[in-house]
Amino acid sequence: MSLLTEVETYVLSIVPSGPLKAEIAQRLEDVFAGKNTDLEALMEWLKTRPILSPLTKGILGFVFTLTVPSERGLQRRRFVQNALNGNGDPNNMDRAVKLYKKLKREITFHGAKEVALSYSTGALASCMGLIYNRMGTVTTEVAFGLVCATCEQIADSQHRSHRQMVTTTNPLIRHENRMVLASTTAKAMEQMAGSSEQAAEAMEVASQARQMVQAMRTIGTHPSSSAGLKDDLLENLQAYQKRMGVQMQRFK
């Protein structure tokens, strides 16, 4: 796996699923391929994106700045600086300085990532802030190692909380989660459908599913009534794709 592929993988792992994630993935691909060279426009676009947490925006801004060639005097962006200040905690800053000194001795991506993984997310963000604000310099490879270690920690905690939700025995939470998943699956089907004859069929299935979820929420239904809803939808989507000549084995 190439270095940039690895960076893209880690960064996208902390972006919530949805149309915005697809858009960010495309921007990252363009940046890494050298197709997007307007850093200012890129940062302006990032700043106004909804849904993303300030820290995620800060990390993306840091990655864009590392990758896109820019004039030396280009201003640093406040929204990135604020996100990478470790919540203003002096302890984070102290640890970030210690980590920075260790990173200065590293020359490889994996070496930097290993060193960084033993620090807290706050210290890692502060260390990125040091580098972003030009208070310290490390090689791009080492900076990417720091980025990936931070993303790994964030993704780990997201995964733990997601697992808690998925394995919860509370039937109401499970019911709501199934309805949310069915609804977002329906939305994805509508976006993928395009404008062929079979597309009308897929759109109809998706639309019915969304109406059903709406009705279930309005009248309040038994928590088990949503079981299998998303799987039924996905089966429909795969049947539609087969007719279109697209073979996607795994959506579940």
From Swiss-Prot:
<dbReference type="Pfam" id="PF08289">
    <property type="entry name" value="Flu_M1_C"/>
</dbReference>
<dbReference type="InterPro" id="IPR015799">
    <property type="entry name" value="Flu_matrix_M1_N_sub2"/>
</dbReference>
<dbReference type="GO" id="GO:0003723">
    <property type="term" value="F:RNA binding"/>
</dbReference>
<feature type="region of interest" description="Membrane-binding">
    <location>
        <begin position="1"/>
        <end position="164"/>
    </location>
</feature>
<dbReference type="GO" id="GO:0016020">
    <property type="term" value="C:membrane"/>
</dbReference>
<keyword id="KW-0694">RNA-binding</keyword>
<dbReference type="GO" id="GO:0055036">
    <property type="term" value="C:virion membrane"/>
</dbReference>
<feature type="region of interest" description="RNP-binding">
    <location>
        <begin position="165"/>
        <end position="252"/>
    </location>
</feature>
<dbReference type="GO" id="GO:0042025">
    <property type="term" value="C:host cell nucleus"/>
</dbReference>
<protein>
    <recommendedName>
        <fullName>Matrix protein 1</fullName>
    </recommendedName>
</protein>
<keyword id="KW-0472">Membrane</keyword>
<dbReference type="InterPro" id="IPR001561">
    <property type="entry name" value="Flu_matrix_M1_N"/>
</dbReference>
<dbReference type="InterPro" id="IPR015423">
    <property type="entry name" value="Flu_matrix_M1_N_sub1"/>
</dbReference>
<dbReference type="GO" id="GO:0039660">
    <property type="term" value="F:structural constituent of virion"/>
</dbReference>
<keyword id="KW-0946">Virion</keyword>
<feature type="short sequence motif" description="Nuclear localization signal">
    <location>
        <begin position="101"/>
        <end position="105"/>
    </location>
</feature>
<comment type="function">
    <text>Plays critical roles in virus replication, from virus entry and uncoating to assembly and budding of the virus particle. M1 binding to ribonucleocapsids (RNPs) in nucleus seems to inhibit viral transcription. Interaction of viral NEP with M1-RNP is thought to promote nuclear export of the complex, which is targeted to the virion assembly site at the apical plasma membrane in polarized epithelial cells. Interactions with NA and HA may bring M1, a non-raft-associated protein, into lipid rafts. Forms a continuous shell on the inner side of the lipid bilayer in virion, where it binds the RNP.</text>
</comment>
<dbReference type="Pfam" id="PF00598">
    <property type="entry name" value="Flu_M1"/>
</dbReference>
<dbReference type="InterPro" id="IPR037533">
    <property type="entry name" value="INFV_M1"/>
</dbReference>
<dbReference type="InterPro" id="IPR036039">
    <property type="entry name" value="Flu_matrix_M1"/>
</dbReference>
<comment type="function">
    <text>Determines the virion's shape: spherical or filamentous. Clinical isolates of influenza are characterized by the presence of significant proportion of filamentous virions, whereas after multiple passage on eggs or cell culture, virions have only spherical morphology. Filamentous virions are thought to be important to infect neighboring cells, and spherical virions more suited to spread through aerosol between hosts organisms.</text>
</comment>
<comment type="similarity">
    <text>Belongs to the influenza viruses Matrix protein M1 family.</text>
</comment>
<dbReference type="GO" id="GO:0046761">
    <property type="term" value="P:viral budding from plasma membrane"/>
</dbReference>
<dbReference type="InterPro" id="IPR013188">
    <property type="entry name" value="Flu_matrix_M1_C"/>
</dbReference>
<keyword id="KW-1048">Host nucleus</keyword>
<comment type="subunit">
    <text>Homodimer and homomultimer. Interacts with NEP. Binds ribonucleocapsid by both interacting with genomic RNA and NP protein. May interact with HA and NA. Cannot bind NP without genomic RNA.</text>
</comment>
<keyword id="KW-0468">Viral matrix protein</keyword>
